[in-house]
Amino acid sequence: MTGGTLNFITFNQDYSCLAVGTSKGFRFYHTDPFSKIFSSDEGNVSIIEMLFSTSLVALILTPRQLEIQNTKRASVICELTFPSAVLAVRLNRKRLAVVLECQIYLYDVSNMNLVQTIDTSPNPNAICALSPSSDSCYLVYPRPNPREDVGAKAPAHLPPPSQYVPPKRGDVLVYDALNLKTVNVVEAHKSPLCAIALNHDGSMLATASETGTIIRVFSLPQGQKLFQFRRGTVPTSIYSMSFNLSSTLLCVSSTSDTVHIFRLLNTQKNANALPGGGPAQGTRSRSFDVNDPSPHKGEVPSAGNGNNGSGSHKREPSGSFGNMLRRSSQMMVRGVAGVASSYLPQSVAEMWEPERDFAFIKIPKSSNNRAGGLSATPLRSVVAMSSSSPQVMVVTSDGGFYVYNIDMEKGGEGYLVKQFSVLDGDDKLTNSDYGA
């Protein structure tokens, strides 16, 4: 497969693979080391979803039709047609969730039988997450907002109106996808949601609202707030949120060219709220649609040209004067906030207390500018953390794949160590255990 327009990029559930959908087929890559492991020339793929590193893949080739393929056998397992366009697909070993604008269809993966149809508020940005865990198999999405004029009759020539209207608040409904029941509603934000993510075992939920300034993390299924972070003060749209495999870090990308990494410390304040048992394992939001119509509240320069090889864009290292000054100012603000918040009610104190990022990275600017030297559209990005090293992986809507090192002791700015392109013309495949 060569060329084609990039439509969609997503990590698999444990970030070991990357799936790329284009106008001329799709590809799978290993993320570490970066290498292509599968390629197909079939169709115009607008959405793609892998099932871990198995040969099972879900594809959207036309807006209303989903196709489940076994890539190892080159066979189609089933085809499903829906009443409106498919906006997102979520998959684990037991459940398949297909997200439409006003409905979610839930299937049993073992036989592909429909087990539940869930009506939702209008959800054009497909805000939804499914835990990769087969045990705590939670599906989370914006809480439906019922219509107030339920008794009003629509004109006979019009279709009946939806029973729900767009949400006015950022409440998250937690649904048990195995037992098919609602288990909780998390009141996460006062304004509507922009992004949500679950960790691997379904014990943590990360949320961001449309303003994009505050990130919150809750326990599941209890819904108790564990952490609250400030991403920044300028409103922005959150593109991607991702837990690392030990659920000790949370990565967030947005319309800003900065990726923030927040540390999930088990402080005394949060000790009683943390889920019981061992450390959780991580997942996402881990994909983006290049043609996503969601509004952008800021403009982001495009990322690098994505040539294969190691990056040379070492920015300010963690021990630099700039980072020392940045950390010193944050410590001063936290000190003042700590004193002030001790005299304030909890609801007011929370405005002072949100932690800032532990580390951050800057996405490189692209040399592939449009006419006039400016990008035609803001660059979208999705982030994940390596399971084998302290590295952050960033993939961008211009096909760039970037790997950054993070200092796990000092934090600060990470530096670029590798960069590749998922749109190059090299069709050589590497040997791997993909699909085994």
Swiss-Prot record:
Residues 286-299 have a biased composition (Basic and acidic residues). It is found in: Preautophagosomal structure membrane; Vacuole membrane; Endosome membrane. Pfam families: PROPPIN. It comes from the Eukaryota. One of its GO terms (cellular component) is fungal-type vacuole membrane. Keywords: Autophagy, Endosome, Membrane, Protein transport, Repeat, Transport, Vacuole, WD repeat. It is a peripheral membrane protein. GO terms for biological process: autophagy of mitochondrion; glycophagy; nucleophagy; pexophagy; protein localization to phagophore assembly site; protein transport. The N-terminus might form a beta-propeller domain involved in specific binding to phosphatidylinositol 3,5-bisphosphate (PIP2), leading to the association of the protein to the membrane. The L/FRRG motif is essential for the cytoplasm to vacuole transport (Cvt) pathway, for the recruitment of apg-6/atg8 and atg16 to the PAS in nutrient-rich medium, and for its recruitment to and dissociation from the PAS under starvation conditions. PANTHER family: WD-REPEAT PROTEIN INTERACTING WITH PHOSPHOINOSIDES WIPI -RELATED. The PI(3,5)P2 regulatory complex regulates both the synthesis and turnover of phosphatidylinositol 3,5-bisphosphate (PtdIns(3,5)P2). Necessary for proper vacuole morphology. Plays an important role in osmotically-induced vacuole fragmentation. Required for cytoplasm to vacuole transport (Cvt) vesicle formation, pexophagy and starvation-induced autophagy. Involved in correct apg-7/atg9 trafficking to the pre-autophagosomal structure. Might also be involved in premeiotic DNA replication. This is Autophagy-related protein 18. It comes from Neurospora crassa (strain ATCC 24698 / 74-OR23-1A / CBS 708.71 / DSM 1257 / FGSC 987). The lineage of its organism: Eukaryota, Fungi, Dikarya, Ascomycota, Pezizomycotina.
